[in-house]
Regions:
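Short runs of predominantly hydrophobic/aromatic residues within well-ordered alpha helices
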Residues: 11-15, 44, 62, 72, ...
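Cysteine-centered iron-sulfur cluster-binding motifs in ferredoxin-type domains/subunits
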Residues: 12-31, 59, 63-83, 326, ...
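Iron-sulfur cluster-binding electron-transfer modules in prokaryotic oxidoreductases
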Residues: 85-431
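Non-heme iron-sulfur electron-transfer modules
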Residues: 1-7, 31-64, 82-112, 413-422
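N-terminal glycine-rich anion-binding loops that anchor highly charged ligand groups
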Residues: 23-26, 36-41, 219-222
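Alpha-helix capping and helix-loop boundary segments enriched in small/acidic/polar residues
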Residues: 16, 35-39, 57, 233-240
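Short, intrinsically disordered, charge-biased short linear motifs at domain edges
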Residues: 2-15, 55-66, 181, 214-217, ...
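N-terminal, well-ordered alpha-helical segments
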Residues: 26, 46-50, 64-67, 73, ...
């Protein structure tokens, strides 16, 4: 059954484009960790092709190797043939998901998260309200004091320790409407993609994004009908649900009639920018998706174009930057975040060795593959500590939580702060 599903889902021409040169191997975190050919992009593509050609039957080892992939796409920029590995691994996971039998509790968690929570923003706000109550009412302190969290896996305990303050309301409630006018002359009509998790766990970052855009001359439009971007769905094999979400977002932002669509999360932005590929076989939505994808920008691209750093406050601290994999490898945004950080008056920018290597967050990878994620994080934190930076900056919520967990794990709390680039820029640009 899996073989037939793979044959139906996989883009065979792209499989054949792999030249087996091996340039992807030094860029691949799982290959570098294990040294196994099967744990490299080249190896995984060879496995996909072998199954599609009928040379081998897909077994548990095949599925395990596909699931071990971070989906960081570090292999794509170094591939001379331009093989879209990210699309191939998502197609493979979609095929696996069609036939795989999960334990009942895994089915329940997946159904709850992917179909009943993430796609429904009102429910996400309700969940945020409950988390906020847990954090502020004294329940969290009591739970920690009584040691209740000891029953949870280590990675869950670490995440609870660094969980940001949740919000039960979104940016529309905060700003009192869906249109935030530009300060001064309007340069762009910018659609703000607020994200499902961002507006609950990183609401302050979203508010800062709106303020920075407005002060940079953007009229900010928050499309009310927008939903989750679908990235976690696509990465987990639920591509049909990702397509459903994509159609809703395309419709919402076309209705808003915006010039650009701004994301402040690398993972979301990369997904949004590839809606044209996701909906390529949908005749009704194909052109609409191209319209949408062509307008998606990361917040750093917009700010690098519009802001005047010499008006910023001085920040006499050492700063280093951990690049978001999907921002770098998916959206191809590399220079703008660094140029903004280097422009902060008084700050010393320190290049992070292998700052382009995945931190191990990779969506929910750190929860489902904790051993590999932990190994990558430990290596990353050794490199971070070597910079002696006061601030570790990133541009994606998952990376930010992973960096906070790494700081906690490495005993660097009080010595180093992990911060989203938007929050740092909002700090230095306050008048």
């Amino acid at each position: 059954m899996l073989k037939e599903a793979l044959v139906n889902k996989l883009d065979y021409d792209e499989l054949s484009n792999c030249m087996r040169c091996g340039f992807c191997q030094p860029a691949c975190p799982t290959f570098r960790e294990t040294g196994y050919e099967a744990a490299s992009p080249r190896g995984r593509i060879a496995l996909m092709k072998a199954v599609a050609d009928g040379v081998m039957e897909p077994d548990k080892d095949f599925v395990d190797q596909m699931n071990l992939c971070l989906g960081c796409r570090a292999c794509e920029p170094v591939c001379p043939a331009g093989v879209p590995y990210g699309q191939l691994i998502e197609q493979t996971r979609e095929a696996i998901e069609e036939v795989q039998e999960h334990p009942w509790w895994v089915k329940a968690v997946r159904k709850l998260a992917f179909f009943h929570l993430l796609p429904h923003q009102k429910r996400m706000y309700q969940l945020g309200g409950l988390l906020r109550f847990y954090q502020r009412s004294g329940v969290q302190k009591a739970v920690r004091k009584l040691g209740v969290l000891s029953i949870l896996p280590k990675q869950m305990r670490e995440m609870e320790a660094i969980m940001p303050e949740a919000s039960g309301k979104g940016i529309v409630d905060f700003f009192g409407g869906t249109v935030i006018p530009a300060v001064g002359e309007r340069k762009y009509r910018a659609g703000m993609f607020h994200g499902c998790i961002m507006d609950v766990l990183f609401n302050e970052t979203n508010r800062n994004t709106v303020r920075l855009l407005s002060e940079a001359g953007c009229e900010v439009i928050v499309a009310l009908d927008q939903v989750c971007c679908g990235a976690l769905h696509a990465h987990s094999g639920e591509r049909e649900q990702a397509r459903n979400l994509a159609r809703k977002n395309v419709a919402a932002f076309r209705k808003a009639d915006v010039d650009i669509i701004v994301s402040n999360a690398g993972g979301c932005g990369a997904m949004l920018q590839e809606y044209d590929h996701l909906l390529a076989e949908d005749a009704e939505w194909q052109e609409k998706a191209k319209w949408f994808a062509s307008r998606v920008k990361d917040i750093s691209e917009v700010l690098a174009l519009l802001v005047e750093p010499k008006e910023w406050q001085s920040l006499p601290q050492r700063i280093t930057y951990q690049s978001s994999c999907h921002l770098r490898n998916g959206m191809k945004v590399t220079k703008e975040p660094v140029s903004l950080l280097q422009a902060i008056p008084g700050a010393t920018f320190v290049q992070l060795r292998e700052g382009d290597r995945c931190c191990g967050s990779a969506g929910i990878y750190n929860l489902v593959q904790p051993e590999m994620a932990g190994s990558l994080l430990d290596e990353k934190m050794g490199q971070v500590a070597a910079t002696q930076a006061d601030m570790l900056v990133t541009s994606n919520p998952g990376c930010l939580l992973q960096m906070k967990a790494g700081i906690h794990r490495a005993g660097l709390e009080g010595k180093m702060e992990a911060v989203h680039i938007v929050d740092l820029l909002a700090r230095v640009s306050q008048k």
